[in-house]
């Protein structure tokens, strides 16, 4: 097994980025960035704790859920979940976050890197309400880098091509949880938990 152990070695292998890739980072939102955020219903939030422990958490809501506060600040609402709060614990120790915003059907993505603050309340929480419920918390991100990421990973994977989707290659959620995570629980109980009622308690 051959490993890469230096930045110089890595550059020797990969070469230098093209000018349009090297110079695409910005620190403020363009109007097109605002339009992208308004059209995006889903993002991934990457964090790392002080000890290096990493987490990537999906966040999703109706399109436009990431609220633009000003040219360098956005906020992402937190909805009821499993209460692990792995990413939040990481942010308390290390505020640096990386975000990727998706628009279904598009092969490019919008990336945002910055410093996060956890908010327990703010006047704009009312704007984030869904079905009459305000968020429990919000992640406010001060933008340090923003740029668009190329489409090659999506093109290679054919991610948005329905003919490549095969969701039934694995057991349903309840059966998977019983097999991997909670073998002592009954499948009937897990089916009830992950059944139709599961989608009724999103907010």
Stretch-by-stretch model annotation:
Residues 1-203:
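Binding-site signature for planar aromatic cofactors or substrates
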